[in-house]
Amino acid sequence: MATESTAAAAIAAELVSADKIEDAPAPSTSADKMESLDVDSEAKKLLGLGQKHLVMGDIPAAVNAFQEAASLLGKKYGETANECGEAFFFYGKSLLELARMENGVLGNALEGVHVEEEEGEKTEDESLVENNDNVDEEAREELREQVYDAMGEKEAKKAEGKSLTKPETDKEQESEVEKGGREDMDISEPEEKLQETVEPTSKQLTESSEEAKEAAIPGLNEDEVASGKTEQESLCTEKGKSISGAYVQNKEFRETVEEGEEIISLEKKPKETSEDQPIRAAEKQGTLMKVVEIEAEIDPQVKSADVGGEEPKDQVATSESELGKAVLMELSGQDVEASPVVAAEAGAEVSEKPGQEITVIPNNGPVVGQSTVGDQTPSEPQTSAERLTETKDGSSVEEVKAELVPEQEEAMLPVEESEAAGDGVETKVAQKATEKAPEDKFKIAANEETPERDEQMKEGEETEGSEEEDRENDKAEETPNESVLEKKSLQENEEEEIGNLELAWDMLDLAKIIFKRQETKEAQLYAAQAHLKLGEVSVESENYIQAVEEFQACLSLQEQYLEAHDRLLAETHYQLGLAYGYNSQYDEAVAQFGKSIDVIEKRMAVLHEQMKEAEGSFTEYEKEIEELKELLPEIREKIEDAKESQRSGNVAELALKATLVESSTSGFTPSGAGASVSMIASRKPTDGASSSNCVTDISHLVRKKRKPEEESPRKDDAKKAKQEPEVNGGSGDAVSSGKEVSENMEAEAENQAESQTAEGTVESAATIKSTAC
């Protein structure tokens, strides 16, 4: 039994707990109720705040408040719910006021600007600046002293600057002089380098070189030359060195620099004649001439050895090859520029000395000198001299360029081929000239390239000009795009402005639908106000027909639920009169303005009755009566304006009709008069004789006579037909055809003259008949 009782107690406890759980509210539903209460209260607060801002004139703040309230209620109840109608109505009303404020041209642009604060800031800024009137004499004297001290310091600084600038100019002059000296040093550097390289070895060979020189100048004795040659070879064999012709040439080069005055004159002549060549190139040409003379002095030694027969030909060839290689090595190490004209001068000088072999570089290549010492004939000395004189006289360089071409081609030949062909020492001079010829070739090519560069520069400028034009065209193409963007931005701004009206229309239309769905008086009156505001939106968007419809709908609803003396009716009549006036319906406008005045007068009468019945204060009634009295003159002015515009409109219509009638009559009367005259003229000849018909026919022909302009192309064709056989060598048929054309033209002219005379006679006969009738 105890167990059963405990089980029953447990079951009862479970049932009680279950009932308690069912009675307890769910936490989610309670939270929803709290949220709903918060949303409604918040929406009411926002609506009150928005109406306050709307009354105070803070339209943007009112729009924000109504927008937030509408969004809260729309999220909770849905956009078409009855609870959202009021929020949507006030939101649309505030948007309408905002659109009016944005579109209003005569609005207060300085609204919200604190002018007094700006004036106070200006006074504060002015107070910071010292006034001259408030400054004492002592302060003025102190200021003067400070100014004078500052001026003196500036003058002292200027003087120091001038003194500093003078030594700087002196330093610049010295630096320029040093630069000039450095350039001279640069010019003389190759010669000094040659002397330094020659000094250690040339002292050992002074005796042999002097003997070789003495043998070359008087008569080139074969025995002395041979002995000098053997001494040179003995020295070379003792020291274990091969003879280097470059060392001998460098030694004799230094001696010729000390003795040769003619060479100096030859160095100066190219400087005088060729102004376009730089100074350094001229001096280097002089150095090459010296080397050529040294070779000319050394050549007889080698040739005399060949004549004497004391040495075999193989040794002579080896010595020649060694000399050629040494000269090539020395010349390749030096930066010497030579011209073929200078080489020709050197060849001419060598030919003047007796007993020496002439080495001339002709146009077609180097000429191998003859081994005989007696009779020696130059290959082309006159051509080289002519080239020299032409260049000295300042003639054109084109001939020299033409002569340089084969010499430059010879530079491509290797040295070994010239030695194998037995060119000997003469090839060394050609090799030296041809080795330096590529540099001249570069110079000549540069001179030839100058016009090409000029043309390229011109083409580049043209291309740049075309690029600039393309850029300008691109800019011109871009500018329309920019203008399109600007137009789009303006359109967007306009859309934003129109967007406020559109949004206001949408909100008010939604509020109208919500209120019309309800059958209460308050909802219907809100629907009437929605129609009124929709009409105002239509007026702002200049859709006056729609505005009239909306105002009439509003008026119909108000007449159902409002008394005849209500001020809302007066407002609706007034707005409807404005819409009619904007739509040029002045009669209806005057009628609506009159109805508005009637409503106001009824309201004033009702207020006076209420004042009599009331026992308390009459301030409220008196205040409203004064407001209504102030409205009456404005409405009456609107009536007068409508009547005047109606009169002016009628006058304008009459004037427009008159102008239209005049234009129509002026367009048709001349043609009618002409038709009547033509009919009269046509009837009279029919009543008369048949000859009048002939007269009319002749006049018809006279009007269509040919003009001289039609004859000119035919005459031109006839002239062309006459000229073609003469120029192209055609047959006489074309000439005959041209004559036939001219004869036809003359015959036509005669026929025209006869027809004109016949017409004149017929016309005179017609006039006589008409006078007789």
Swiss-Prot record:
Q: Which Pfam families match?
A: SHNi-TPR (PF10516), TPR_8 (PF13181)
Per the record, residues carrying Phosphothreonine are T123, T169, T377, T450, T463, T669
Nuclear localization signal, short sequence motif: residues: 702-708
Q: Where is the composition biased (Acidic residues)?
A: 116-140, 406-420, 461-471
> In which residue ranges is the amino acid composition biased (Basic and acidic residues)?
141-196, 230-241, 265-283, 387-404, 433-443, 472-491, 707-725
- The coiled-coil regions, if any, are 597-645
Disruption effect? Mice develop to blastocyst stage, probably as a result of maternally-derived Nasp, and then die.
Q: Which InterPro entries match?
A: NASP-like, Tetratricopeptide_SHNi-TPR_dom, TPR-like_helical_dom_sf, TPR_rpt
The family note in this entry says: Belongs to the NASP family.
What's this protein's name?
Nuclear autoantigenic sperm protein
Say which species the protein is native to.
Answer: Mus musculus (Mouse)
